[in-house]
A protein has these predicted regions:
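Extracellular glycan-interaction surfaces
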Residues: 3-74, 171-183
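Extracellular structured ligand-interaction cores
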Residues: 11, 36-38, 51-53, 85, ...
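Predominantly extracellular/luminal cell-surface or secreted proteins
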Residues: 15-17, 57-59, 89, 104, ...
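Short surface loop/edge beta-strand patches of beta-sandwich-type extracellular domains
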Residues: 22-31, 92-95, 129-135
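Extracellular/periplasmic catalytic domains that process cell-envelope and extracellular macromolecules
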Residues: 32-33, 79-82, 99, 135-138
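Extended recognition patches within non-cytosolic domains
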Residues: 48-50, 67-68, 102-159, 164-182
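Extracellular glycan-interaction patches encoded by glycine-rich segments
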Residues: 77-103
């Protein structure tokens, strides 16, 4: 699971948890709780150097300082993109811990680990989402645009549509992180 820890404000950690006690926590402070943040996590368990197996970018800058680092073993088989339930905006196994925020776009690539520049770019000194349609999504990859009326619809071409639970189309907003950033 990938999650933002908010034990206080500013948010105090961004965490990756995997099976077998894997836990990596980065500690960038997210001071503006109303601002747009772009998170990118790349996982490649085939890497021989443990710190290269999970990488994290916040707003286009790689974060390398960790408060906790229990890395997975090389070639570890993780739950993401396996036959397990995937949840977005909710802490797995704890339905009372839900995201209190907005998501503009979510891309999950299967079999490819890449940095933030595949998903976002700077326009007029503002980080905005890029169209990921040219990326290789792999078999289990997904692109969720969270568009009104189709919040769980997959736009990757894989038809990996997510089932909504306790959410309706009226939970969407027409505002986007790219509003006003130019084209």
């Amino acid at each position: 699971q990938i999650r933002i820890l908010a034990s206080n404000t500013p948010y105090d950690a961004f965490e990756f948890n995997g099976n077998g006690g894997v836990k990596i926590a980065w500690t960038p402070l997210l001071r503006d709780i109303s601002g747009f943040y772009h998170f990118c996590v790349a996982v490649d368990t085939t890497q021989s150097t443990n710190t290269n197996r999970v990488k994290f970018w916040l707003n286009g800058v790689q974060v390398t300082t960790t408060s906790t680092a229990n890395w997975m073993s090389q070639d570890a088989d993780l739950q993401v993109n396996n036959t397990t339930e995937h949840q977005i905006g909710e802490l797995r196994y704890n339905a009372s811990t839900e995201l209190d925020g907005y998501m503009a776009d979510m891309v999950l690539l299967d079999g490819t680990a890449t940095d933030y520049s595949s998903f976002a770019e700077f326009k007029n000194n503002v980080l905005v989402p890029k169209n990921p349609s040219g990326l290789s999504f792999g078999t289990n990859g997904v692109h969720l645009k969270f568009a009104s009326g189709a919040l769980g619809a997959d736009s990757s071409g894989n038809s990996n549509t997510y089932t909504l639970n306790n959410i309706d189309a009226d939970h969407s907003s027409i505002d986007t992180p790219s509003s006003g950033a130019g084209s």
